[in-house]
Amino acid sequence: MKFFDREREINEILHILNREPDDIYFIYGPLNSGKTALIKHIIENKLSDDYKVFYINFRTYLISEKREFIEAIFTTKKDDFFEKIKDKDEVLNLITKGVRILTGIPIPEVEFDKLFEEKINDAFQYLNSLLLEVKKSGKKPILIFDELQMIKDVVLNTENQRFSAFPSLRFGNGQKYLLKELFQFLVSLTKEQHLCHVFCLSSDSLFIEYVYSTGELEGRAKYLLVDDFDKETALKFMDFLAVENNINLTNEDKELIYSYVGGKPKDIKYVVEESKFKDLREILEFMLKDAVQKLDMFLDMLNYSKPKVDVGDEVIEIKKDNVIEALKLFKDEYEVSKKHIPVPVYTYLIKRNILFLNPIEGILKPQSYLVWNAIKRLL
């Protein structure tokens, strides 16, 4: 399928790339709002060969220690045929003359093995030296971390214990957190050396809230929201998909689709494609019933379990009555100020992918229109 719209976001990111690197950019938004599709469209279709992109996708990794982080970001292979990188000359060829997009930081196998024995800063210094070589060759380096929150719990210590990087969770004394070390390195790349553009993608709004609120990156980071489509854009997207799939959608059909799934690109695409051989209203009702059942099971489990979340130094038990009270706020409103819901409750609902938080605006909303409609139908 051809890429659709997002001209405002595309132009903003291209404008950033035309400037000297000076900030770390966090691209965030609800689940399935199109963050990865957007950044891939830009690096694959909108950039000249003057750029060299290092795209690291943490989505497929379970990272709990330094070794797994190193395995995720570095590669000893030259291409898809798994030919090994022999020496630094081959690395230099890859980063200065090879393809525009690399899905790992190239490193000779012998050097790669050494990284496991050394400090994490040695790995960062190796990457720094590569980025300097890219710049020396006349190209502009771009570093992209997709689903960066996957490393938020990694602790740099000999026991490889796991503690959360969030201030709301309890720390171990003297622990060094990989995320903090990485942020310091990224600040060096952008604010200090002006060497490399850095983009960090995440659908975890609690992670973005942590980054935004701690002040650790104050004056060093900017935030770009990739949200679900607004109604006007969603209706245009339906027209676009109808043409792509040779389907006739009336205005009433499009209004009906929007009333169920809103501007969620993935949901709209599914509905339009399914409508080619199924009844439209049946598709939408099935999706809503599924969302209602999932929400109902979630609430029912609260009759038998006592979930807890950590807030500061306290462990707070979440009660079903408080959850229902919070969700009822969305019966008449799609967006609610986070001040209207206690922190432990909205934290729990975000963790369960029921709510999404925009920390920059302090606004909470359901993760999707389907979830919103499920709340209204069930409560």
Curated annotation (Swiss-Prot):
GO terms for molecular function: ATP binding; ATP hydrolysis activity. It holds the Pfam family MJ1010-like_2nd. ATP binds at G29, P30, L31, N32, S33, G34, K35, T36. SUPFAM superfamilies: P-loop containing nucleoside triphosphate hydrolases. Keywords: ATP-binding, Nucleotide-binding. Disulfide bonds: none annotated. Belongs to the archaeal ATPase family. This is Uncharacterized ATP-binding protein MJ0801. It comes from Methanocaldococcus jannaschii (strain ATCC 43067 / DSM 2661 / JAL-1 / JCM 10045 / NBRC 100440) (Methanococcus jannaschii).
